[in-house]
Amino acid sequence: MAQFFKAKPNSSKQLSAKLSLSVNQLDHLGAGIAQHQGKVVFIPGALPDETVTVQLTEQKKNYARAKLIKVDTPSSERVAPECPHYHTCGGCDLQHMSLSGQREHKEAALLDIMAKFAGAEGGTLSPALTGEGWHYRRRARLATLFDKNTKHLSLGFRAASSSNVVPISQCQVLAKPLSDLIVPFAKLLNQLSAKASLGHLELIAADNGHFAVLRITKALNDKDLAKLSAFAEQHQIHICLQDNEGQFQGVGAELVLPVYQLLDDKAESDAVSLSFTPGNFVQVNGQINKAMVAQAMDWLAPAPDERILDLFCGMGNFSLPLAKMGADVIGVEGVAEMVTQARVNAKANNLDKLTFYHGDLSADLSLEPWMGKIDKLLLDPARAGAFESLQWLKKMKPRKVVYVSCNPASLARDSAVLLERGYRLQQLGLIDMFPQTHHIEAMALFELTK
């Protein structure tokens, strides 16, 4: 009878054993990398040049994962995390590393990915777009968890790789006025009779005030509405409710939309503002978003009457400033609600050289009314990237392409397409949109050479 080899499962003895390892680098997700018995070992929380005591948690053929038990020899980049919830909340994962160290790591990781997967080693490395390391988030969504036994509602963030809600009293990366509202909101929500029917709470800091969006699964009674209204007045915040159908209703007043300015240091006549409904996507780091928009304008250098295509345009984060500078701009977005809001924003900013379309940018674009020769192209896709859209470069033939990316892996893949089509990487720069986390965003400029 034939006998087949069956790999033995990880023994409890193997996994419970404690090891002393030397960490030599970070992976792209911010975990320390060490070597043990010919395998790569990933250690969240460990830093390069550290000697650490770890416990293996997972063994695979070519790699292992381990839990950090103790830092025996700390790195010069190691710092004490500022947030008391750091080791339980799933939001941040690099607070134990200096801000300068984080940025150096992210920049090196970006260059490594681009060289390895795109073969893109040319071009000029632009200075990273950086800002405040703490209290930079102007928007956050807090989860709620109602305990049927204690009748208590917890308000916080979800733990890493878990649906468990970690109650928090503050958030060191959330705008300070919003962070200061967490405890008062938790107290308020526990006073509502409908607390078992409450969903997430979203907090927003905008240029025209502070906002809170409370998700509800059933209508609130008058007493609960009165409590919310009194809270809004006391804390000078706009509160709105979002029902099961996704509709929004203001509490104690008409619904007010948050507004952001997109460009800094502009005279009133040159200002560009963007309003949005609470359900729309916006960049959470306002300081970096302004710098990012300014850099995109500088790299694209839009001239009057140039035809510029903005794919994955959202509500006009880049389209509006491009049109303000005199270009004929076409914005295309896959989410219909955001296209509607983009048109509202164009009208509010008195921009008439701007047209928005709704469309699936992963589909056949050959018959789209906007498809054709353009002067310049801006791309700001989601994490999946813009691979399908770039297949139509021959029809568009832009002289310049600015690619704004929230995923270096898809940026590298798509950069390879651009390089194959005769474009050269001219500029590449890190965008540190999310300090204290491993997340890497970037901007790249390509120019047609043939």
From Swiss-Prot:
Keyword flag Cell inner membrane: no
Active-site residues, record numbering mapped to chain: 406 (nucleophile)
TRAM domain segment(s): 12-70
Pfam families: TRAM, tRNA_U5-meth_tr
Principal EC category: transferase
Residues annotated as binding S-adenosyl-L-methionine: 283, 312, 317, 333, 360, 380
Matching InterPro entries: 23S_rRNA_MeTrfase_RlmD, MeTrfase_TrmA_AS, MeTrfase_TrmA_CS, NA-bd_OB-fold, SAM-dependent_MTases_sf, TRAM_dom, U5_MeTrfase_fam
Keyword rRNA processing found: yes
Protein name in UniProt: 23S rRNA (uracil(1939)-C(5))-methyltransferase RlmD
Organism: Shewanella baltica (strain OS223)
